[in-house]
């Protein structure tokens, strides 16, 4: 948006520890020990992991990307990916070029033991929230549309039941008062209290 290069990544690796079994996925912040080279030092109180050679290699890769970006704004240069000091063969990151992110292609780097450049991060989940949910919400509004030109007919209140002798009277009610109407009763006062709210009995 402002002309500065943007590089998008998703970290898909985590160290092995008792707190995080092998079948679990990477979580937010799992790249932190790799950024600061913890696998090269060994387990710490903060990161009690069983670091392998692959963890050391991945840490070297991440530190190279981060320091390159800090120096030049491009994680691919000036220092190329090279971890032969850890493995006898080249790692796959040496064959991957981390592309810039743009709204059209939406490329990002999948960082893990099998790195690759992918596009449209979590496209299905993003489409659900950006397109399907708003669409369903708009359908809800369509079915609850209130007309601005059609008036709702007025409801006529029901009349009191009548008998040949006139309105039906409730036993004990004053003469001429229909039985369906409530009578107001006053709640008793408590000691030292003011007037109570009035209730109705049917």
Curated annotation (Swiss-Prot):
Disulfide bonds join 15-49. Transmembrane segments: none annotated. GO terms for molecular function: neurexin family protein binding. It is found in: Cell membrane; Synapse. It is a single-pass type I membrane protein. InterPro entries: AB_hydrolase_fold, CarbesteraseB, Neuroligin/BSAL, Nlgn. SUPFAM superfamilies: alpha/beta-Hydrolases (SSF53474). Residues 1-202 are extracellular. It comes from the Eukaryota. One of its GO terms (cellular component) is plasma membrane. Glycans are attached at residue 50. Homodimer, and heterodimer with NLGN1 and NLGN2. Interacts with neurexins NRXN1, NRXN2 and NRXN3. Interaction with neurexins is mediated by heparan sulfate glycan modification on neurexin. Interacts (via its C-terminus) with DLG4/PSD-95 (via PDZ domain 3). This is Neuroligin-3.
